[in-house]
Curated annotation (Swiss-Prot):
This is Pre-mRNA-splicing factor CWC25. Belongs to the CWC25 family. It is found in: Nucleus. Belongs to the CWC complex (or CEF1-associated complex), a spliceosome sub-complex reminiscent of a late-stage spliceosome composed of the U2, U5 and U6 snRNAs and at least BUD13, BUD31, BRR2, CDC40, CEF1, CLF1, CUS1, CWC2, CWC15, CWC21, CWC22, CWC23, CWC24, CWC25, CWC27, ECM2, HSH155, IST3, ISY1, LEA1, MSL1, NTC20, PRP8, PRP9, PRP11, PRP19, PRP21, PRP22, PRP45, PRP46, SLU7, SMB1, SMD1, SMD2, SMD3, SMX2, SMX3, SNT309, SNU114, SPP2, SYF1, SYF2, RSE1 and YJU2. The modification Phosphoserine is found at residue 129. It comes from Saccharomyces cerevisiae (strain ATCC 204508 / S288c) (Baker's yeast).
């Protein structure tokens, strides 16, 4: 009667194709993970060799050159490039400025670090970013509104306006409420 293999009916049977597929997929995942690990280990080894070479070569060099090498090594040198150069590129790309032949004929100069100032909070900010902020504040209508509001709040100007309008001074100016 029952000459069939009852193990084929069990979900855990290793002879079933779906179970073989699961095993094969996990093996492939392990193989790809091992390959990724090996490539990462090779990258780490290359970085170590580069660090050793840079350390040996920068022993007798000044501190600023060491900092430049460290930035190049870490891949962050693009963050510290001169903002003036990026502003010119931005203006050209936006169509605000056309390139002159004198600019095109100039040899490429290495980027110079932007001058920094230390603010009251102690954080170093670049001068160009301060110029951008001041330019934005001048163009911003809300900042103009706040400046005029500050000018109105000065006691001398409010008394003068009140006297010119009514002829007698106000005892206390009405407080401006900010919502």
């Amino acid at each position: 009667m029952g000459s069939g293999d009852l193990n084929l009916l069990k979900s855990w049977n290793p002879k079933l194709m779906k179970n073989r597929k699961k095993v094969w997929e996990t093996e492939q995942d392990l193989i790809t993970e091992q390959q990724k690990l090996n490539t990462r280990l090779k990258e780490i080894e290359k970085e170590r060799e580069l660090n050793e070479l840079l350390n040996e070569s920068s022993k007798d060099k000044p501190e600023t050159l060491k900092n430049d090498l460290a930035l190049k090594k870490s891949g962050l040198e693009w963050m510290y490039q001169d903002a003036k150069l990026s502003d010119e590129k931005e203006d050209y790309l936006l169509g605000k400025k056309k390139l002159d032949s004198s600019i095109l004929n100039q040899p490429a100069t290495p980027p110079v670090r932007a001058a920094t100032t230390i603010s009251a909070s102690g954080a170093a900010t670049s001068i160009s970013s301060q110029k951008k902020k001041s330019k934005l504040l001048k163009d911003d209508p809300m900042s103009k509104f706040k400046v005029t509001k500050q000018q109105r709040r000065t006691p001398d100007s409010t008394k003068k306006r009140a006297m010119s309008q009514r002829g007698k001074p106000l005892s206390k100016p009405a407080p401006d409420l900010d919502y």
